[in-house]
Amino acid sequence: MALSNMDVKGTSSVTDPDGTEKKSVTFNTTPPMSVYLLAFAVGDFVHVENNNDFRLPIKVYSTSDKAISQGQYAADLTAKCLSFLEEKFGIALPVPKMDGLALADKQGAMENLGLVTYAEASMLYDPHLTPLSRKAALSSTIVSLEAQRWAKDH
């Protein structure tokens, strides 16, 4: 699977000179943005999607099945946060989707437009195993990164 700032425009099969069949993925063009916000990832990802009525699909991806069992809180909180910020500032996000990617070997987080990258510990939450203090830290990380879009990136 390939992820980037924008949604997938199309896919095609390509054959390498050695005869290996591969998949080519083309993404829609990003709106004007700072170059440092460009993000892409390729891997075997699983995901969960937000459960509320926000206008954009919000998905949390991970390289493990943890996204399915532990990504729901982050997906739902991101949708609530973005809904609030869009309403408060009267500026809609200029992308057709918002994904979060939890990475096992990453430290911190980066607010890439359309594809935010997080350390697994900063995005995945299991209500039966994770301390409440980590839920609070996760919430703070998500809210501060999303708020930066209006205070820093626009």
What are these regions (language model features)?
Residues 146-154:
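Catalytic Zn2+-binding segment of zinc metalloproteases
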